[in-house]
Amino acid sequence: ETCASSLEFTESELIIKHMYIERKMTPLNLYLQEETDEEKITRALDELGLCIKQIAMANIFPGDMLHKNFGITRHGRVIFYDYDEICLMNERNFRSLPKSDDPYAIDTLSVAPNDVFPEQFEHFIVGKRKFKDILKSLHGDLMTPEYWHEVQEKCARGDVQHFTPYNASMRFDRG
């Protein structure tokens, strides 16, 4: 279907039958490269952790969680926008890395296609050590299999959380 087929012209109106709208965002990796304000960086990394948690509580595992796959809006909200590798939470097996003194043990680890090792997330969600440390201090639970098992259990029970698009300070006071 072409664009022309979704438009209708009348004497005084242009009627758009079908339209996609995208929110303008800055890729999170570029934002973190350029931002120098520590408070804004911390807030963005907090939003990143919250975004991942909200996606998970919606029974979706985001798959490719590199920070380049997230964007930040002008209001400071972090939004996931790479849906290539998403799947349902129950389609993943969250495991702990085996404890070993052998530095080569990881090379011989048996891994099934749906296995996920949350302890590895810190190595690829964000790049710089400073960002990793901030993310771990705010959302260290994301790097544990226990957190992901808990989310899987909640999803299996049908527990649904309500998420608001803006934090409390930006919402209308209805009281």
Give short role names for the model-derived ranges.
Residues 78, 112, 132-175:
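Regulatory N- and C-terminal appendages and interdomain linkers associated
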Residues 1-43, 47, 57, 62:
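Conserved ATP-binding subdomain of kinase catalytic cores across diverse folds
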Residues 117-124:
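Long, low-complexity, intrinsically disordered regions
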